[in-house]
Curated annotation (Swiss-Prot):
Its EC number is 5.2.1.8. The modification Phosphoserine is found at S77. Catalyzes the cis-trans isomerization of proline imidic peptide bonds in oligopeptides. Exerts a strong chemotactic effect on leukocytes partly through activation of one of its membrane receptors BSG/CD147, initiating a signaling cascade that culminates in MAPK/ERK activation. Activates endothelial cells (ECs) in a proinflammatory manner by stimulating activation of NF-kappa-B and ERK, JNK and p38 MAP-kinases and by inducing expression of adhesion molecules including SELE and VCAM1. Glycans are attached at N108. GO terms for cellular component: cytoplasm; cytosol; extracellular region; nucleus. There is a cross-link at K28 (Glycyl lysine isopeptide (Lys-Gly) (interchain with G-Cter in ubiquitin)). It holds the Pfam family Pro_isomerase. This is Peptidyl-prolyl cis-trans isomerase A. It is found in: Cytoplasm; Secreted; Nucleus. It comes from Bos taurus. Its main location: cytoplasm. Keywords: Acetylation, Apoptosis, Cytoplasm, Disulfide bond, Glycoprotein, Isomerase, Isopeptide bond, Nucleus, Phosphoprotein, Rotamase, Secreted, Ubl conjugation. The keyword RNA-binding does not apply. One of its GO terms (biological process) is positive regulation of NF-kappaB transcription factor activity.
Length: 164
């Protein structure tokens, strides 16, 4: 089985920035990967298209996926509002790692983050389910609009997304 690839076309205040593609590790975390894949295609009638990265901390990560409230308090999975941590096989080994944001154990919804550094203190707490395949330079460009408290200086959105 080949792991799926999805893409995000990123915009800054409505202006195109570029494309980021992700390999989703369906071979290790099938349920978590399928959630992200389906939210990227929008095939369930809801998903990431048009949503923003509400929290960007340079040298740490870019967080998005709250397509219901757009501020980090919302979002939902394809399995219902929340789903359990699938496993912690994969680790936060460095830049480009794609992992689930949560509010504690077994609270996965749709929020995710892209690491821009090694974040080993998150191992065993957040489910890693993918990695940047192409476009890490776009993620690095997104970082420039972040701040230490995570507030972004411009609106960073997923203008389009889907499966390749």
């Amino acid at each position: 089985m080949v792991n799926p690839t999805v893409f995000f076309d990123i915009a800054v205040d409505g202006e195109p920035l570029g494309r980021v593609s992700f390999e989703l590790f369906a071979d290790k975390v099938p349920k978590t990967a399928e959630n992200f894949r389906a939210l990227s295609t929008g095939e369930k009638g809801f998903g990431y298209k048009g949503s923003c990265f509400h929290r960007i901390i340079p040298g740490f990560m870019c967080q998005g996926g709250d397509f219901t409230r757009h501020n980090g308090t919302g979002g939902k999975s394809i399995y219902g509002e929340k789903f359990d941590d699938e496993n912690f096989i994969l680790k936060h080994t460095g830049p480009g790692i794609l992992s689930m944001a949560n509010a504690g154990p077994n609270t996965n919804g749709s929020q995710f983050f892209i690491c821009t550094a090694k974040t080993e203190w998150l191992d065993g707490k957040h489910v890693v389910f993918g990695k940047v395949k192409e476009g890490m330079n776009i993620v690095e460009a997104m970082e420039r609009f972040g701040s230490r408290n995570g507030k972004t200086s411009k609106k960073i959105t997923i203008a389009d997304c889907g499966q390749i």
